[in-house]
Amino acid sequence: MSGFRVIVIDDERIVGQMIKAAMEPDGYKVETFLNAEPAFARLREEKFDVVITDLKMKGIDGMDVLRTIKTAYPEIKVIMITAFASLDSAVEAMKSKVDGFFAKPVKIKDLKECVQKLLNRADTTAG
């Protein structure tokens, strides 16, 4: 798993910290952001494999993050997490090609399994 790069965008600092603390011991390189603008700047600077984003945030929300990334960086896997999960938001995310969708509170074990499966699938289709 070593070397995969992950961005977490969530306006709740503790969420990013928890995901980072859970994933880095497994070899992931995780960077956290409280909003989308600096995360987009970072994506322009370096290659990342996965973006985990909150749905409801001030400014650019998770749906806009999803659409922007899928347009500019279609190879990046996007996982959405939200405290406001609804059938409508899940359907909208699926239509926008989200790779994973989780309601908060997220079970870290499930999130890590999703990331691993997405990256394993990407490895087999790339090679």
Q: Which role fits each region the language model picked out?
A:
Residues 13-31:
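Two-component/phosphorelay signaling modules centered on CheY-like receiver
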